[in-house]
From Swiss-Prot:
Residues 32-312 form the FERM domain. The keyword Transmembrane helix applies. Keywords: Membrane, Transmembrane, Transmembrane helix. It holds the Pfam family FERM_C. This is FERM domain-containing protein 3.
Length: 595
């Protein structure tokens, strides 16, 4: 009887264990629905499993389009905290998503081509055109009034073709929303260019001409990240093919080329851009609303720098956001770089796939998207006061004309290559890039708040600059040292006790090292490790002084000095410490000289 009672529960436990294992295997094979919204607002659905990686979805959409130049594109999603992320191809989709299935994602342009002329296939140009059209509609592409009219006319020509009085009413542009602020003056200018300058252009040529104009604008390819600078002013950060850019109001206040950016890092809510030694402001710091927004900003910067800066993907290294002696987030861009993508595009030899275009009337982005997103979200306030009288007449103000192209000269419709010859060579364009503030419009850069990757909460950002704990520390430091008076005998007694304890500690440590006293092996190994560490420190410290102070031009010393980590240590830690020690020494010498 006793044996039967003992075996029964054991059998039940075994059955439960088998049931647990079978359910876990079943959960691994469970399919989850994933919906991807495309650039024309259509949707594609598929089913994935728990271990499916992000690369599967990217390949799935590229196969759906028959897209070969796929390295410019990526898939973006939003977590429950309204923070945007780019889907990482080498990680499991299930582990990246912080919400429950079914999942909804968006297929978007991740890296904007620096030169649209080098895009091989019409399909790729069409998808980039759809992305630029979205950027225009949501206010991310800031430009002058004349440029805005030309871009709008290219969109109308691509969507509707030539102008015919019998088919197009007098105010046919007003039926469609192309810009976030679309005035009657802008609509009249768009119709004028559409009627007179773009006649005869096919949709492919009109789209190509739009790309040629858009890629010359300062905000081309900018995915705006709102944050606060060191003074508390709101700024928009972005990454382009030229480098890291900062916009405030209607001006680009910073442009740091990728060759001048040594390192990008973040700590909590603070994002740092560390430049080379020749820069006036070697380190730029910005504050985001949340740590997740800061990490997303850092990842975007690392990926864009790797894509546009390096000549080969094999040159890309894993980067860390940490300081020198502390471990932080590590990340590596795993895709191709821009030069490799252009080289691969030049080798494409196939019959171009058919392009299925969707015009404005069939797209939801100009109707339902405006109602669902724009109205439900409060737009960011302009950073600089914009003239209210001109807002109704001029949606994008007459600013300083940007380089390269003149809108008054239409591109030749018969050949996009001939029209492209009007543009200056890329090398001359890069030589004209300046880092001084550049006025690009009379209106403040104010993209739609509903589509920003890192929403800004002004109250939360302002809390970064308010430290209540600072007041408590000041109160604690107000204690007077006058209450700590003691007589000379008490100090002498204390000194004798300290000397006695020191002698005992030295004798005890000597006995441990010689083996006269038995101690725990763990303690002994720790003490030996400590001694070895101190010995290494005594060796490394003179070597560090040799690197910092000596002018020896050995090859390995020069390589160490040029590393971003060493430059960061030199400017952020060593120089301030050196100045502080020098100041203290000068004070002591001055006091000795006076005495």
């Amino acid at each position: 009887m006793f044996a039967s009672c003992h075996c029964a529960p054991r059998g039940r436990r075994t059955m439960k264990m088998i049931h647990f294992r079978s359910s876990s295997i079943k959960s691994l094979n469970q399919e989850m629905k994933c919906t991807i919204r495309l650039l024309d607002d259509s949707e594609v659905s598929c089913h994935i499993q728990r271990e499916t990686k992000g690369q599967f979805l990217i390949e799935y959409i590229c196969n759906y389009y028959s897209l070969l130049e796929k390295d410019y594109f990526g898939i973006r999603y939003v977590d429950p905290e309204k923070q945007r992320h780019w889907l990482e191809p080498n990680k499991s989709i299930f582990k990246q998503m912080k919400s429950h299935p079914p999942y909804t994602m968006c297929f978007r342009v991740k890296f904007y081509p620096h030169e649209p002329l080098k895009i091989k296939e019409e399909l790729t140009r069409y998808l980039l055109y759809l992305q630029i059209k979205r950027d225009i509609f949501h206010g991310r592409l800031l430009c002058s009034f004349s440029d805005a009219a030309y871009l709008g006319a290219c969109i109308v020509q691509a969507e509707f073709g030539d102008y015919y009085p019998d088919e197009h009413p007098e105010n046919y542009i007003s039926e469609f929303e192309i810009f976030p602020k679309q005035s009657q003056k802008l609509e009249r200018k768009i119709m004028e260019i559409h009627n007179n300058e773009l006649r005869g252009q096919s949709p492919a040529i009109a789209e190509f001409n739009l790309l040629l104009k858009a890629h010359t604008l300062e905000t081309y390819g900018v995915d705006p990240h709102p944050c606060k600078d060191s003074r508390g002013a709101t700024a928009f950060l972005g990454f382009t093919a030229a480098g890291f850019v900062v916009f405030q109001g209607n001006k680009r206040i910073h442009l740091r080329k990728w060759s001048d950016v040594c390192k990008l890092k973040f700590e909590g809510k603070t994002f740092y851009v560390i430049g080379s030694q020749k820069e006036k402001n070697a380190v730029l710091a910005f504050h985001t609303s949340t740590p997740a927004a800061c990490k997303h900003l850092w990842k975007c910067g690392v990926e864009n720098q790797a894509f546009y800066k390096y000549a080969k993907s094999s040159q890309i290294k894993t980067v860390s956001s940490s300081k020198i002696f502390f471990k932080g987030s590590r990340f590596r861009y795993s895709g191709k770089v821009a030069k490799e993508v252009v080289e691969a595009s030049s080798k494409i030899q196939r019959d171009p796939p058919e392009v299925h275009r969707v015009n404005i009337t069939q797209s939801r982005s100009f109707h339902s998207l405006n109602k669902q997103l724009i109205i439900n979200m409060e737009p960011l306030q302009p950073l600089l006061p914009s003239p209210t009288e001109q807002e109704e007449e001029v949606p994008v103000g007459e600013g300083v004309p940007l380089p390269k192209m003149d809108v008054s000269e239409p591109l030749i419709a018969s050949s996009p290559v001939k029209g492209a010859q009007c543009a200056d060579p890329p090398d001359e364009e890069e030589d004209r890039v300046k880092e001084d503030p550049l006025t690009i419009s009379e209106l403040a850069y104010n993209p739609s708040a509903s589509l920003l990757p890192t929403p800004v909460d002004d109250d939360e950002i302002n809390m970064l600059f308010d430290c209540p704990s600072r007041l408590e520390l000041e109160r604690e430091d107000t204690d007077s040292f006058e209450e700590l008076e003691a007589d000379e005998n008490a100090f002498l007694i204390a000194e004798e006790e300290e000397l006695k304890e020191a002698r005992q500690a030295l004798s005890w440590s000597y006995s441990i090292l010689t083996g006269h006293i038995w101690v725990n092996p763990l303690v002994k190994s720790f003490s030996r490790l400590l001694v070895v560490g101190l010995g290494l420190l005594l060796f490394v410290f003179p070597l560090l002084l040799l690197l910092l102070e000596s002018g020896i031009d050995l090859s390995f010393l020069c390589e160490i000095r040029q590393t971003p980590e060493f430059e960061q240590f030199h400017y952020e830690y060593y120089c301030p410490l050196k100045e502080w020690v020098a100041g203290k020494v000068n004070i002591v010498l001055y006091m000795l000289g006076c005495s």
